């Protein structure tokens, strides 16, 4: 609730995306959203009148840090390498479940996966695939929320927003205007 207020989410319809080690999208609502599929959850806001509906993922920035360590590159180098690869990574896909999955699929046993790996894939492909994999996980969260409320624009906060490339990938994949 405090993070939501700090991000400027004060009125119904206000939404924010927090992109750090973990990530989430939270949207202020007049009343809690009851998702029969239990993909989302609600937290009462500080005003005691509204709540925010959340969708979360465990390993956003954690995935970026993990692949950076594996490849021995800094964030600037990761961004440069990823920018050299076309969207779609020539078929390389990353599922960002290093610490299980939360929304919209709650599965503590889920694990991270690189799929479609072949000999054409270089470091840049793996870097971009991580950015895209996190973006598609956030799209699943955004799409689940869109079933209950309009979601077109979010206040974007967190260390991940320092990457212009990653921010743009997230905006493109989720179809969200990031502010």
Model regions and ranges:
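Active-site core segments that coordinate phosphate-bearing ligands/cofactors
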Residues: 1-179
